[in-house]
Amino acid sequence: MAEEQARHVKNGLECIRALKAEPIGSLAIGEAMAAWSEISDNPGQEQATCKEEEAGASGLSKPCLSAIGSTEGGAPRIRGQGSGESDDDTETLGFPSRNLQASSTGLQCYYVYDHSGEAVKGIQDADSIMVQSGLDGDSTLSGGDNESENSDVDIGEPDTEGYAITDRGPAPISMGFRASDVETAEGGEIHELLRLQSRGNNFPKLGKTLNVPPPPDPGRASTSETPIKKGTDARLASFGTEIASLLTDGATQCARKSPSEPSGPGAPAGNVPECVSNAALTQEWTPESGTTISPRSQNKGKGGDYYDDELFSDVQDIKTALAKIHEDNQKVISKLESLLLLKGEVESIKKQINKQNISISTLEGHLSSIMIAIPGLGKDPNDPTADVEINPDLKPIIGRDSGRALAEVLKKPVASRQLQGMTNGRTSSRGQLLKEFQLKPIGKKMSSAVGFVPDTGPASRSVIRSIIKSSRIEEDRKRYLMTLLDDIKGANDLAKFHQMLMKIIMK
């Protein structure tokens, strides 16, 4: 299959060079255009059939039209077909009746030969195109055996000009060319030829252009391709390849600029989006020679043509880190909520502690003002209990022993009082206090803890002012009472004012 394709390509290149050296005349091109227009208007006549004559001993095989073109007044009208195209895609083209062998503008047709040099019959392939040429001016191009078998046109029926297809003889054929006889040409030469021909293109557009695929790169061949055997009903077998569809991340790569100028009308490109640096997973398909390339080998071979997924992995790491931070924040928020609940309890505990501190301070103040009697102090040396050693761990507390520390304030010693108590049949520790230690009676005309008695001194006026300020009387009345207090001079008037003030407050 590869040898046949190489042979067809070489034959096509030879045709292109021949056409470049000896271009077809404008008259022949005009007649060919007219015939092609008629065929386009009648699709039923687009494909014609041609059966191989078994009676002939010449062993004529089906010719292959590799290229048709012109450099005079128009671009070449050539269609190259690969092994992946079907027989239904072959184009037909009509030519006028001319002595193509004698004329320099004739078509050069080639036959397929095997390695022994003999013409191969029955070649059924997408690349094989038959050329039928008769004495009239509407010669047509048809496909291979498969196309002739599937054609709806009867072989014996006349065409549009009234000639039967079977009556036509084969076109004048030049000597056969082998694969070794044709000089190979690089793809750059083909593109250069197309560019030179497209510059002087003034020929009307027929809607057919030369599609020359770039030469396959053997270094890009992948081991993942699966050969598919395809029968051709001939001596050779066509081996295609199963093209795998791969998923690669990254943007679609920009296509290289074609060296040939477009032959058709231009299209507006104002709304074309710009290239992106990254995109979602896209399918990759490589039609060249039916080979596929893995993304890893492409990255190594092209050196960064395909976008690396390092940025995608970094984004995933950032997302994971953000999710972890969010989770930690939720934990911190839950702990803060629990702390807010404990805050109220802590405040209540602080209040209770403050109250206890106030109570302790009050008790300390009261204890500091109390005189504690020390055991053994004030005892009579003649008392038998005076020599008794007192436990040092015992602390003096008031009321523990009512008989202690009373010798200094009683009229009689403790021993005499005990003996007198025993004689009376009862024990008593009471004694009469000395007069200097006895409290004086409370005077009714003097201020004491029992009640306040105002006098003409400044202390009495200060006490009355404090009573007025701490009362719940209105402010206007307080100011009025302060004014009256300043005007009072005598003790009796001050006492009456105090009585009146207490009545107002009690109301």
UniProtKB/Swiss-Prot annotation:
Residues 134-145, 260-270 have a biased composition (Low complexity). Residues 361-377, 396-410 are annotated as: Interaction with the L polymerase. Residues 459-507 are annotated as: Interaction with the nucleocapsid (N-RNA). GO terms for biological process: DNA-templated transcription; viral genome replication. It holds the Pfam family Paramyx_P_V_C. Belongs to the morbillivirus P protein family. This is Phosphoprotein. It comes from Measles virus (strain IP-3-Ca) (MeV).
